[in-house]
Amino acid sequence: MTKDELIARLRSLGEQLNRDVSLTGTKEELALRVAELKEELDDTDETAGQDTPLSRENVLTGHENEVGSAQPDTVILDTSELVTVVALVKLHTDALHATRDEPVAFVLPGTAFRVSAGVAAEMTERGLARMQ
C-alpha cells in the first residue's frame, strides 16, 4: 500500500472505532498502526453485543503493572535455541545482540538480533522483522 492508501485506511478504521487516529509517521509506522487498529476492530466485532460478566480474569486489581518473572517455558537457557532476525521497524524488544551474548532493548531498522523461534515467527508474521 502507498502512504496515501494507508492514511485513507487509518481514517476509515478510526471512524469505525469512533476515535481519532494519528495519520503521521513513516510508511512502516502507518502500516503497523493499520494492523493494530484492524486487530482492535476484530476484537470489538467478536465481543459486540455480548455482555461481559465480571470475573476474576477481567477485573482490574491494581497490580497489573507489577513486574513478574518470565514464564518457565519462555526462558531460554541455551543461546543455540535463538534465531537471528533483522528489524524492519524500530523495536523495543527483549533480545540478544546478533553476534554477542549481550542484551538488546532497542533495535533500529536493518539491525540483526536474536530471539526465540516463536518470537521470531510472530515478528515476521506481523511485518516487524524478517528472518536472516
Swiss-Prot record:
Its main location: host cell. The keyword Signal does not apply. It is found in: Host cytoplasm. Keywords: Host cytoplasm, Viral genome packaging, Viral release from host cell. Residues 81-132 are annotated as: Capsid binding. Pfam families: Packaging_FI. Interacts with major capsid protein via c-terminus. Stimulates the interaction of procapsid with the terminase-DNA complex, thereby increasing the overall rate of DNA packaging. Before packaging, it likely coats the surface of the procapsid through binding mediated by C-terminal domain. FI presumably dissociates from the capsid once it inflates upon DNA packaging, and is not present in the mature virion. This is DNA-packaging protein FI. The lineage of its organism: Viruses, Duplodnaviria, Heunggongvirae, Uroviricota, Caudoviricetes. The gene is Fi.
